[in-house]
């Protein structure tokens, strides 16, 4: 104790401060309208803010939101990935991790050229792989992995092999049918253009990730789904309409069926039980078929010249068949009916009718 200081009989009591969440502003405490309805409403709102749930999603409750394509990430949209990712220069002044930044930095290997400004394809440049390209930014090929796979002609045009289990920060492939991109070569005002929400997108995604089998478990419908043949035609024909191609294609195949011989193994497809048009136009047969898709264009082009040669050489073929049957009868290889006349010649008229 200091000299002259009185002894205190009671200890000092420390009063804790008010919590910040429960404090109101000073103007509200000393306001002359403290007991007004507006003041009581502010007090009620201040008390409810601690118990009301937040509008922002909880990443712990929804682990899918933490993925590379989560809606929380503003840089995961297709437009930003194709045209702005590692293209736009970074505006940060301080040092930071370049791999975590979506923008381009001086001297960075992942830097991309703007595909809207520089006209280059999605094919990798062979000279750049060897060590350096002399053309530089004027090269018509892609320099690096990011320019190759983030190019608008290749980005998310193929499904990801990992699907929903992909953990890559930047994935160049599609993880769902909605993410699969189709390259539109036709004008947007056409009525028969592909719809983003149509079943063709989901069907194409399933066909691209599923192995090729002999017969599918169920017959696809022509009005709701597209066959692989129709999809290949749509990609090869470009701006031509599928609705215009199908009628002409049917007429072509109908004429080809007429010219097929009855001993052809494909003749059963032209019967009422099946059709040579394939699974995209009617139901598939229930009997097992050979694996793989039937390339009708290729088969038709191969068979027609053979049939022409057969028709041209029909007389020679008939003579050979008559000679062969005559030799077999002479060598007693053909079993004869006891009631049949031995001098009667075999009936080969059906061969002539077949080849006429």
Swiss-Prot record:
Record-linked InterPro entries: Unkempt-like, Znf_CCCH
- Superkingdom of the source species: Eukaryota
The record, for PROSITE patterns, names: ZF_C3H1
- Which keywords label this protein? DNA-binding, Metal-binding, Repeat, Zinc, Zinc-finger
Outline the segment boundaries, as ranges, of region: Disordered: 209-235
Gene Ontology cellular-component annotations: plasma membrane
Gene Ontology MF annotations: DNA binding; DNA-binding transcription factor activity; zinc ion binding
Give the record's GO biological process terms: regulation of DNA-templated transcription
Q: Where is the composition biased (Polar residues)?
A: 225-235
| Zinc finger annotations (C3H1-type) as residue ranges | 120-146, 155-177
Record's protein name: Zinc finger CCCH domain-containing protein 49
Name the source organism: Arabidopsis thaliana
């Amino acid at each position: 104790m200091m000299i002259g200081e009185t002894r205190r009989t009671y200890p000092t009591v420390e009063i804790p401060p008010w919590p910040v969440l429960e404090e109101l502003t000073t103007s509200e405490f000393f306001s002359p309208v403290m007991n007004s309805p507006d003041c009581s409403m502010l007090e009620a709102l201040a008390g409810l803010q601690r118990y009301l749930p937040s509008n922002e999603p909880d990443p712990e409750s929804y682990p899918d939101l933490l993925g590379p394509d989560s809606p929380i990430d503003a840089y995961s949209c297709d437009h930003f990935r194709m045209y702005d990712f590692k293209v736009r220069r970074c505006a940060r002044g301080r040092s930071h991790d370049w791999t975590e930044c979506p923008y381009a930095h001086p001297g960075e290997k992942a830097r991309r050229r703007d595909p809207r400004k520089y006209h280059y394809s999605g094919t990798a440049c062979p000279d750049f792989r060897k060590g350096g390209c002399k053309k530089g930014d004027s090269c018509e090929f892609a320099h690096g992995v990011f320019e190759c796979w983030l190019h608008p002609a290749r980005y998310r045009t193929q499904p990801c092999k990992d699907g929903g289990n992909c953990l890559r920060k930047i994935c160049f492939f599609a993880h769902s049918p909605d993410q699969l991109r189709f390259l539109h070569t036709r004008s947007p005002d056409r009525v028969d253009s592909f719809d983003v929400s149509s079943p063709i997108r989901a069907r194409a995604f399933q066909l691209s990730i599923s192995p090729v089998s002999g017969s599918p478990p169920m017959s696809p419908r022509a009005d709701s789904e597209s066959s692989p043949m129709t999809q290949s035609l749509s990609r090869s024909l470009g701006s031509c309409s599928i609705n215009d191609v199908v009628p002409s294609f049917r007429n072509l195949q109908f004429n080809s069926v007429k010219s097929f011989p009855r001993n052809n193994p494909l003749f059963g497809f032209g019967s009422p039980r099946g059709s040579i048009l394939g699974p995209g136009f009617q139901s598939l047969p229930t009997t097992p078929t050979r694996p793989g898709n039937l390339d009708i264009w290729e088969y038709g082009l191969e068979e027609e010249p053979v049939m022409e040669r057969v028709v041209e050489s029909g007389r020679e073929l008939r003579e050979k068949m008559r000679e062969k049957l005559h030799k077999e009868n002479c060598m007693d290889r053909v079993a004869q009916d006891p009631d049949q006349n031995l001098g009667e010649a075999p009936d080969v008229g059906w061969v002539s009718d077949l080849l006429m």
